[in-house]
Amino acid sequence: TTYGFTIGGPIIKNKLFFFANGELQNTPAIANRWRASEDGVANADAYISRATVADLQKVSDIAKERYGYNTGSFSSFPSDNKNTKLLARIDWNINNNHRLALRYNYTKNTVWNAPNASSMDGGTRMSGSRTSQYAMSYANSMYSLDNLVHSLSFDLNSRFSATLSNQFLATFSKLDDVRGTNSSIFPFVDILKDNQNYISFGEELFTYNNAVHNTVWNIKDDVTYYTGNHKIMVGLNYEHQMADNQYLRNGTGYYRYTSLDDFVQGAAPEIVCLTYGYNGENEPASRVQYNKLGFYLQDEWNVRSDFKVTAGLRFDGLFFDNGDLMTNNAILDLDYNGRHIDTGKWPGNSLTVSPRIGFSWDILGNNTLKLRGGSGLFSGRLPLVFFTNMPTNGGMIQYQAQVNAKNAKDKGFTMDEFKGGILSTEALKQKLYDLGYPQTIKPEDGTVPSSICGVDPDFKMPQVWKSSIAVDYTVPVSFPLNVTVEGIYNKTLNAAMLKDWSQKDINGFTRFNGADNRPVFPSDATYTDEAGKSLPSAYMLENTSRGYGWSTSVTVNAAPAKWINLMAAYTHTVSKEVTSLPGSNASSVLNYLSTYEGVNNFRLHNGLNVTPDRFIASATINDKSGNHFSLIYETWRGGYNYSYMLANDINGDGYNYDAIYIPTDKQVADGSFRFVSEDDKTRFMDYVHNDSYLKNNQGKYAEPNSLYSPWVHRVDFSYKHDFNLNVCGAKHKLQLSFDMKNVLNFFNSSWGVSKHLNPAIGNEARILKYEGVDAEGFATFSTPESINGNTKTWTLNHAIGQCWYASIGIKYCFN
């Protein structure tokens, strides 16, 4: 449901004007489609989980009776998305030479989400999601993403003479991204069954005190001067940006039990985690702020009437403020193979130079055939959350306690300390204090957290070299018919990536025998301190120059009659990168990308957010009777991009994000790729032969983000009718509208619906399981029962956003 208004008009005739627009939208959605089973048997096609009604009710009752916690329903979940927008603008014609525009924007967007699929700390991440055929969670474990934006702008345009003009633009933006929940403060609890997620409850483990607050000031002044056949523009730009990041993963506590019986009996949990602020601070925050000063100049040179060259040069200086940081000397003393991490310093001041040149050539001199293009360096930004990861995980603001059997033993206790049930957040914090975990910290002493984040002192903001070439052709027919062919190429110069400095180089590691000969990480794969204790993971933000991309597009525009406009366009896109930075937490970004040689050895792969093929066509009709028709057809491939992976950790690096090797038929036949049984081999190879990606990439490791969802086809229709009215001698207009999205779906529920990964395969494409190494050093594999030659890779995505919907509108324009 959408409600909106638009109003505008003069405050002072021909001098001062106002405009306002508001919209309130409430969109039905389904954030969790899964439901509990009666018999413990999952049915992925029907979105029935193996988690039973009886077990879910038992856990909910125990949570209420034993701990006073309300889990919420396991059959009804919050889901509706809400969006509120407001725009207000004042335009002032000060005089003939000066115009001022003031604008205010407000946006609030709320979207509900199921709990994080499987991320956790202190142990092995499960392959099955917490809401899936394997597991269920409760309504109060859902969370909302609330995006709030306030922005103001002051835009003054001045003309001082026929050859000299100026634009002064100042903007202020306040952007707040926060999480909401219906849960009371309570630890998040995972209960496993058969070494897989089964039931989860509590406040979502990444929601408490999770917010990013960005404040941005931007001021620029551009002077434009015309002289002869040159248009020269010179400008200055100043930007100040500050980000406060609040991020307490496991901020209310985290428990993981290996079985339902362990939870019911109050047995020792497998893992306990808590992140807390020092000195009793319940809402710790980390801050990064920088100043950016830019100077740029550009010359548009009309060399001839049919040939124009545009050349420009931009200088950007970036200056970080170290005043919000403290060096953790305990971290600084750690020796990562001769490298040390100073969490009290941002990257040094840097200067980026970006030259650019472009041209436009009217080849025939009559605007019927144009060649245009350009090349240059372009700089961008990086979300500041990747910087605030350093103070957040620098051990000076908050402490991340991750307790399991191994590190408990290192500290001189056992997991039996946590027998007897779940402690409240405050009681758990006190328990950790009693076990020797720090309550306060001094910079000169410092402490070593479970994991560390840092930024390379020489880190630079992203920069690419971009080149393009295009041809615009007007076809010599009796009506306007234009064709444009364009190609764009991008080469990465500086992109952001993460590396774990604690990991040793894989050169020299033992490898499996056979076709899948990936390295095997030994027990001493990480660097150690002088006492022989493994150093914590050190996630370092660095630069890489690896990566490129290109796209080609063809666009046709035609107007065969005055009352109709036609358009068609096709775009093919390729993007290769080292990482898409999926997420905001450093460990998630690094560890949750499929690889076969470990987290520091990513190969170039397809970008996560790429739609490789897209075609769109439209027809717009406007007749003399006030009727306006619009028909849009769109089809694309991709949008849901997956990576074929193993169900478990084959290389021993501690992360279950290992790409599968796709064997050839010969490698399977001659035993260089081995299965534990003939049945596993037959079912897997039958699936390979029936899946186009696997079949076309046999003999290779599966590339991340390369399993693209199939083509989807959509048609949208719009009709508007204008009623011209004469009210008290003034011309008014009343417009009625009818819009229908995804028209095909109205006629057939499977038409116009995109496809995503078949739930029978899982929410991640894990189609093989490592079963150990045989006596000859070959890795052996089994195939999940759901995988065979008849298994469909894709299934219809039954989501509200895939359905048709229609809207009726009314608009009244008056003078």
Go through each PLM region and give its residues.
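Hydrophobic, lipid-facing positions within transmembrane beta-strands of outer-membrane proteins
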Residues: T1-F5, T84-A88, L148-F154, A170, ...
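Transmembrane beta-barrel wall of Gram-negative outer-membrane proteins
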Residues: T2-A114, S144-F172, P355
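Short loop/turn motifs that connect adjacent beta-strands in outer-membrane beta-barrel proteins
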Residues: I12-K15, N97, A162-T163, Y225-K231, ...
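Transmembrane beta-barrel strands of outer-membrane/channel proteins
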Residues: A20-L24, L102-Y106, F168-K174, V234-H240, ...
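Solvent-exposed loop/turn elements at secondary-structure boundaries
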Residues: D324-S354, G358-M540, P710, C728, ...
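Extracytoplasmic gating/loop element in the C-terminal half of outer-membrane beta-barrel translocons
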Residues: D434-G446, G626-C728, Q735, A760-H798
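Gram-negative outer-membrane beta-barrel transporters
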Residues: T484-S643
